[in-house]
């Protein structure tokens, strides 16, 4: 691959910025004081661990992690095996069933197999207090993930950005549409999916774009690690 830059190469400096160290410190001290924070510390940066910068083909932006027990593990929209598939992801599966021939809804919501194929599942805020949506929204994570998006915009070419809902669309406003392929739709949440997420055809359009560029399309059927061996 021509672009061998890693996340470490492009983010090392950002991770030394005072705001970022502050964010980490705040999260760490909340954990130490007994507050339950999701995802667990070891999983906070999983999106970057599973999808290296040079491998990014598709970016799906989420908002903040799931705040129920055992759900969040560092990949947007994904939940651990054995945890009930959340409503937004069920609606994503419904759209896949309606548009991808042969897609059958899996009995889990674990999307690591997407991440391993180059789908960056990036929440714009990387931690949350148990049971309190958006509780870490002002800690500095948004500044960090803005930087991540600008680095993908700058260092990669031909990435598909799937921007669902106004939050993701605002966040993605900086993306150069001459360099990248930006697709927008309402959020897959039950509150908005019927306003145009269903029928947006984004999973098909993303693959068509990748194929036109001579890249391998994404297999959108999520498989558990044991199934793919």
From Swiss-Prot:
Question: SMART domains recorded for this chain?
Answer: UDG, UreE_C
Gene source species:
Escherichia coli O7:K1 (strain IAI39 / ExPEC)
Any keyword Translocase?
Answer: no
Q: Give the Gene Ontology MF terms in alphabetical order.
A: uracil DNA N-glycosylase activity
Compartments annotated for it: namely: Cytoplasm
Q: Which family does it belong to?
A: Belongs to the uracil-DNA glycosylase (UDG) superfamily. UNG family.
Active site feature? 64 (proton acceptor)
The UniProt entry, under HAMAP family, shows: UDG
- GO cellular component, as recorded: cytoplasm
* Alphabetized SUPFAM superfamilies for the sequence: Uracil-DNA glycosylase-like
Q: What name does the UniProt record give this protein?
A: Uracil-DNA glycosylase
The protein's matches in Gene3D superfamilies, at most eight in alphabetical order, are given as:
Uracil-DNA glycosylase-like domain
Q: What is the catalytic activity of this protein?
A: Hydrolyzes single-stranded DNA or mismatched double-stranded DNA and polynucleotides, releasing free uracil
